Amino acid sequence: MRRLPGGRPVSPAEVSFPDVVRRLAEASRLGQEAAYVQHGATRCLLHSVAVAYYCDCLARRLGPLGFRRLPLLRGALPHDYFLYDWHDPDPAHRLHGFRHPARALANARRDLALDPVEAEIILRHMFPLTPVPPRCREAVMVCLVDKVCSVYEIFSRRPYPNRRIQSAYALAAGEKPPDRPGGSAQPV
């Protein structure tokens, strides 16, 4: 279980999506994902933020099933933390779908202190393309939400107009959050 400074455990009610995004972005190179296109015209960072956001929404809705929200978010955000343009014809990027989970995990381990659930989420999110299935419910959720988001991004002209996703994306990318209608910034 994660602990706050001073040693107090983090309760599920204290897990805030924007706070987790901010802390991960400050501790890593997560913002660099904005430089790479993932699916369609969607940036890798926007994809990662959207996957984490929808996983968090589902985990809160399915509360009685006991999802561990902090590891869920900390594993979902860097699930595609491979930090290269897989569309380049570079031979090192061949078989990207099969290889990128291990690369993302290596990058995440270099930059972040991961617990076993977070590492499992990153490494197993490409099942069934990668042969070993996820073993924990958080990794299963990220695996499924990742597939839904990927298909949506391929067919959507402007994916994720949701202000919470856009604000979290801006936070991770080090940008100013989008304005709310009426001119004031959206609180995150």
Feature locations, PLM:
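Metal-dependent phosphohydrolase cores
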Residues: M1-V188
